Regions:
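Basic/polar, cationic surfaces and motifs that engage anionic cell-wall
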Residues: 1-7, 17-19, 25, 90, ...
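N-terminal catalytic cores of peptidoglycan-degrading enzymes
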Residues: 1-92
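Sec/Tat-exported extracytoplasmic proteins
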Residues: 29-31, 59, 66, 125-129, ...
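Exposed alpha-helical structural elements
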Residues: 39, 156-160, 187
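Glycine-rich, acidic and aromatic/proline-enriched surface loops and short helix-turn segments
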Residues: 58-62, 93-95, 101, 190-193
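Short clusters of hydrophobic/aromatic residues that line enzyme substrate/ligand-binding pockets
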Residues: 65, 147, 151, 177
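N-terminal propeptides
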Residues: 168-197
């Protein structure tokens, strides 16, 4: 999994945290028409926004903006509206990873390839941090904010995204050993007897 990095402006995120305390992945969308993961990484590196996310994902790239060891400001704040917020006060900026999907075309059509790429990346994060699919939630589920709006307005779109997180991984292929989840590395090591690459 190739992840590019551009450090967020330090005024836009919080302090260091213990990554063993991560319990949730919160899915957002950027709401900007036709934007990219790189555009967002550039913007948050440059501007003082008092908000942030750990990652931005589009159909081609993943950009890390806030290191996972730091608190990103992506799901805090008060309640909005009357729906959602099932996870309010359970999921916080401190115990979650914020993932922003760049999902809208210039004509406000949902880019399905961005959603597929985001699901693949979230599934990778789930393995890395031991998070189950029930702890992958929308910003809407924390504060009631209509985010990601397409996945709030269309429950089926969210359900399809969640289904992608639990699909069998029999067809997963990895270019580099380091990208493999630990469960996949173990049989390879026992077969080789040692690092054989």
């Amino acid at each position: 999994m190739e992840i590019k990095t551009k450090a967020c402006n330090p005024t836009n995120h919080g302090k260091a945290r213990d990554i063993d305390g991560i319990q949730y992945i919160v899915v957002h969308y950027t709401s900007n028409l036709g934007d990219t993961a790189k555009n967002n990484a550039d913007y948050f590196a440059r501007e003082k926004t008092k908000g942030s996310a750990h990652y931005f994902v589009d159909e081609h790239e993943i950009w890390e903006s806030v290191p996972i060891e730091k608190v990103a400001w992506h799901c805090g704040g008060g309640l909005q509206g009357s729906g959602g917020h099932t996870f309010h006060k359970k999921c916080t900026n401190t115990n979650s990873i914020g993932v922003e999907i760049c999902m809208l075309t210039k004509n406000a059509v949902v880019r399905k390839d961005s959603i597929r790429h985001a699901a693949e990346f979230v599934r990778w994060l789930m393995r890395q941090y031991g998070i189950d699919a029930n702890h992958v939630i929308r910003h809407y589920d924390v504060t009631g904010k209509q985010c990601p709006a397409s996945m709030v307005a269309d429950q089926g779109l969210w359900d399809n995204f969640k289904a992608m997180l639990t699909q069998e991984e029999t067809e997963m292929r990895y270019k580099y050993y380091e990208d493999m989840p630990d469960w996949a590395k173990r049989p390879l090591l026992s077969w080789c007897g040692k690092a054989c690459w």
